[in-house]
A protein has these predicted regions:
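A generic structural signal for short, solvent-exposed coil/turn residues
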Residues: 2, 14, 38-40
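Exposed beta-strand and adjacent loop surfaces of beta-rich binding modules
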Residues: 3-7, 43-45
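Short beta-strand segments and strand-loop junctions that repeat across beta-rich extracellular domains
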Residues: 5-18
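Intrinsic disorder/low-complexity segments
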Residues: 8, 24-25, 49
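Short, mixed-charge low-complexity intrinsically disordered segments
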Residues: 38-59
Length: 59
């Protein structure tokens, strides 16, 4: 069984998405990573994408 990693990304002021961390594809872990990043950068958009850049979740 292959567990896909999920990239947690933040949208910078130029509109580009930057990867800040990588989490295992586990819903609670993805949510925790996203919320942690959102707390550090409350005015920025945060998303989780898979290896094909498909959006898994977004804050």
């Amino acid at each position: 069984m292959i567990i896909e990693n999920i990239s947690i990304q933040l949208q910078d002021s130029s509109g580009n998405w930057r990867t800040f961390s990588v989490a295992a594809n586990h819903p609670q872990r993805i949510t925790a990573e996203m919320q942690s990043l959102q707390k550090r950068f409350p005015d920025k958009r945060v998303r989780a994408v898979d290896s094909s850049n498909r959006i898994v979740d977004m804050l």
